[in-house]
């Protein structure tokens, strides 16, 4: 009897195990069938709503939603008050924060003091182009209206249309789900640099999907005639890659083009503002030269059951060292962190030195103008300041440059500081020629002091922004929900952090 019981129990266990294995195999077969079947997200056009994509790609969607977790605000002007001096007369002197996750991109764009407080669709300081890297609605509108039409007019014109943050449609085709370049200006930039679009590989695309936004650009005024026969001018995002992707190549391009982003509010220098040349500086680093892509480190593959997929919580790889870094590097996590921290310390040290040199140069130039320096006297130091600040800005504007290309980053900071020091010496000589030998620049050691010197009416800007957020922005989202462009529960999950008090 006991022997029969043992046999029966053993048989039941074996049957249960075989049943489990059969179900597991069938489940994995079902998963593989689903994986090998590419869904059509939208028959025609661009599906900008990532939650619609999430119905077919739940794993990718769930990890993408985690990008909202990086919602902490780091006020870079508070951290580095020199920035208000360096960008005097330009929007970044008002407000500049460290980057956050893609989920937060659209709200950051609306909240920043740089975009102002429009009272209607045709006013405000910024053009339509300032939405271009913030929303998956951008390729939808470009396809529907045309690229030139999209780039025409003020930023506030499309507030109720551009309501979905960076998401699936920015990088993937809505019919095939394949990686694609959704911004035509990147295609033009690649062709200008000598790349053939037909030669791009899948591995290329795993970086170029990012390069659509993480690149240097300027707004090129482009005249055209609309369908109604009216003359229009579009401010088209343009990549200055015709002479190459290096900082000096772009500087040469801008100089030949006679381009300036703005005239400096303190030194009167015709300035260049680097945007976020992450891709360009990445191409000078060891990871790119070894064949790695952005996605290899920022979107490492992960496993769920039999399904292998890219983690769409795009973030600092140091938050996921085991999957992002230690697949190639052989250090422990702690040792690897220490190596990266050393690289960052070196960059930070040179960065502060360069910023201080540049801030002093701008303030010395202001004094030189005040005591009667001529344009002929000022031409050389002003041009030196322009070049120095461009190289400095290019080296740090993408934030991750110290890791992507540490050698190039340190080189650029060194050259920038050297040029800034040259400008300071030239300006000291000019001041001496005008009888000023003991001038000390004013204190810019805090955000408040630096913004005052830069002429930033901070409290006024915040008051205007809050009026805008409580009025026009609410109207934008209400209209978007009614039109079906946005889920009505959006407000419940949307982080709304700012570097300024929201009273």
Swiss-Prot record:
Listed GO MF terms: calcium ion binding; heme binding; nitrite reductase (cytochrome, ammonia-forming) activity
Binding-site residues, Ca(2+): 216-217, 273, 275
Catalytic activity of the protein: 6 Fe(III)-[cytochrome c] + NH4(+) + 2 H2O = 6 Fe(II)-[cytochrome c] + nitrite + 8 H(+)
Chain residues that bind heme c 5: 287, 325, 328-329
Cofactor: Ca(2+); heme c
Binding site for heme c 2: 168, 171-172, 312
Residues that bind heme: 130, 133-134
Positions bound to substrate: 217, 276
PROSITE patterns xrefs: MULTIHEME_CYTC
Cofactor binding note from Swiss-Prot or TrEMBL: Binds 1 Ca(2+) ion per monomer. Binds 5 heme c groups covalently per monomer.
Binding site residues for heme c 4: 294, 297-298, 404
Disulfide-bond pairs as recorded: none
Compartment list: Periplasm
Family, similarity comment: Belongs to the cytochrome c-552 family.
Role noted for this protein: Catalyzes the reduction of nitrite to ammonia, consuming six electrons in the process.
Name recorded for this polypeptide: Cytochrome c-552
Source species: Maridesulfovibrio salexigens (strain ATCC 14822 / DSM 2638 / NCIMB 8403 / VKM B-1763) (Desulfovibrio salexigens)
Phylogenetic classification of the source organism: Bacteria, Pseudomonadati, Thermodesulfobacteriota, Desulfovibrionia, Desulfovibrionales
